[in-house]
C-alpha cells in the first residue's frame, strides 16, 4: 500500500516536466529591445493606442463636467419622457395614496398633504422647471 502511494506521488511530481509544462512566469529576458523581438514584422505595430497625459485635476474636472451635463440633460428634457400607459398610471387630480404606480403625466408627481394622509397626482411647477410652462 505504501509503495503504491509513493509511486503515485512520484508520478504526479514527474508529470509536468515530462509534458513540457512550465511552472511560474515565462522567461522574458532579452525581449526588451526591438531587434530581439519574436515577430520582427510586428514590432512597429502598437497594440495599445498612445494615451494623452493630463494632470489629475484636469481629469477630475472633465469628469465632473460630463456628469453635470448628463444630469442636467436628464432633468431638463421632459419631452424625452414617454407618456405612461393609462392602465398602469394615476391620472391628474386622482388619488395616488397607496398605489405603487406613477402619475400618467410625465410632469406630474404624487403630492401628499396632511402627514401623507391625502395624496393625489399634481403638476408641481417652478420657474426653472420646464414642465411648468405647459
Swiss-Prot record:
GO molecular function: neuropeptide hormone activity; type 1 melanocortin receptor binding; type 3 melanocortin receptor binding; type 4 melanocortin receptor binding
All residue ranges annotated as the Agouti domain in the record: 89-131
UniProt keyword list: Disulfide bond, Golgi apparatus, Knottin, Secreted, Signal
Signal peptide start-end: 1-20
Gene3D superfamilies: Agouti domain (4.10.760.10)
Subcellular location(s) per record: Secreted; Golgi apparatus lumen
Domain notes from UniProt: The presence of a 'disulfide through disulfide knot' structurally defines this protein as a knottin.
Assembly and interaction partners: Interacts with melanocortin receptors MC3R, MC4R and MC5R.
Purpose: Plays a role in weight homeostasis. Involved in the control of feeding behavior through the central melanocortin system. Acts as alpha melanocyte-stimulating hormone antagonist by inhibiting cAMP production mediated by stimulation of melanocortin receptors within the hypothalamus and adrenal gland. Has very low activity with MC5R. Is an inverse agonist for MC3R and MC4R being able to suppress their constitutive activity. It promotes MC3R and MC4R endocytosis in an arrestin-dependent manner.
Full protein name: Agouti-related protein
Species of provenance: Bos taurus (Bovine)
